[in-house]
Amino acid sequence: MKIKYFFCVLLLIVSVYAYAQGEAVGNDWVAMGLKGKVKSVKTSIYFAEEKGNDFAKGSTLSQGIYPVKKIKQYSEMERMGVKAFFIQFLVNIIPSAITFDKNGFITEKWRYDDIFPKKIVYTYDKKHRLIDKSTFVHEFLETKDTLIYNTKGQLEKEVLDLKTKDETIYTYTYNIDGELIQRNFKKVEDLPLFKEIYIYNNKRLVNKELYQFDQLIWRGLYEYGAEGELIKAISQKIDDFIWHSKYTYDQNNHLKEEYLLINESEKNGFLNRFGSDRRLTYHLTFSTNYLCEYKYTDDKQGNWVKMITYEQGVPILYVERKIEYF
């Protein structure tokens, strides 16, 4: 049955993305859906073995729910402002160890899902703004991401130094209301490679366009509900595909369901369901009618410490999180 796990991964890594205006403002505890003053989270992944009415940890899985290549691809897409809620949840379930400061910001993260372990160190200024993110392999600096803010506290420039390649520079432009209206990507001394244009209505992002050398290559349209929640997103990669997403929420305005169609085909897309804290519980792939479900066990703080993944009703993975509190 273990082989089915890899089938589910292949289903999940289809190139489907959606953009939604930013999550609730807060620290990394909020971003990760953690409750209480969490000091550290260590995540380990095993194959699940049935043991009576419970499950035991089988052999260790060295990668996460997503393989490294897909995580890198999604991370780059996310830098461009692209989001998909079910991918956003699953991409972070990897063998790792994360440490937080008392303000809820990540200070160090170890990733164990690649050939060599990677240590990522986060540095903040006095206003808790991220100013440096450096990645080390065997104590050697692999990448260095430097963030620079203007006098208004807005992110103005970002320099990504890959060490083995040229630097990539991101510059940000805002309107008088403080809304991001343009972001440029370029290599050092080169003309801009990419340009993003953002358009707002009533403080909500309603249109986003991505240009490469002044040629439109990606477009997004977004609609919101009465409470400002994203209810519809149409993302189009020009001359390639259209992804139509609809979102529903519970009475507390928590995301409940994500319904996705690719190229308007009811046979190509996904249905995802979430718990109140946006933990994924249900993932159905329309093209194969393949169902993945996720069941959790929580600690006393309400944070999940065990997740069992099921594929077509068969338990496949046992994910364990060891959480330490201040």
Predicted regions: what they are:
Residues 1-25:
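Bacterial Sec-dependent N-terminal signal peptides
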